[in-house]
Regions:
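Structural beta-alpha unit
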Residues: 1-5, 78-112, 149-157
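General small-molecule cofactor/ligand-binding pocket signal
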Residues: 38-40, 90-94, 143
Length: 157
């Protein structure tokens, strides 16, 4: 029974408020269980800027996006090192559809922590579309973190 419940925790980080809340929860769990923590940022290929809109070629746009994601993740990891010395964690960046990449990477983890934007019924049944797709595709235990105050509307009149 002395086995760590969650030896490896994966947290998806995209810089949004809910992903940073998810990171806070993941850090708390990693500290409580003595777990290894991995931060994952996914470059969504569908969000690559169109060259005509920005006056950049596709290659420059991709490189700029990649650089921005890496800089944001580096800032998060530097903050973690300062605020949680001794915390065992690593960070990685992948490219693709965020939900698909999260589910693929999740296979070697014991718990997945992800923030949900909570866009409402149409966008994702009260979860954001990425978290909704992860919930429906992932076979690993999940912790979905929502912003305080995000809740289903009361269906009563």
């Amino acid at each position: 029974m002395g086995e760590i419940m969650y030896q490896r925790i994966l947290v998806a980080v995209d810089g949004s408020e809910t992903s940073l809340l998810a990171l806070d929860h993941a850090v708390g769990l990693a500290k409580a269980f003595g777990s290894e923590l991995t931060l994952l940022s996914v470059i969504d290929q569908l969000k690559l800027p169109f060259s005509a809109e920005y006056g950049l070629g596709a290659r420059e746009s991709h490189e700029d996006l990649m650089r921005n994601v890496i800089e944001d993740l580096n800032e998060v990891t530097m903050n973690l090192r300062e605020t949680h010395p001794g915390l065992s964690f690593d960070a990685r960046v992948e490219e693709g559809r965020p939900a698909k990449i999260i589910v693929e990477v999740a296979e070697v983890f014991d718990l997945i922590v992800i923030g949900s934007q909570g866009f409402g019924l149409i966008a994702g049944w009260f979860l954001g579309s990425v978290s909704n797709e992860v919930v429906n595709s992932c076979t690993k235990p999940l912790l979905i973190v929502k912003k305080p105050g995000d809740q289903k509307p009361d269906p009563s009149p």
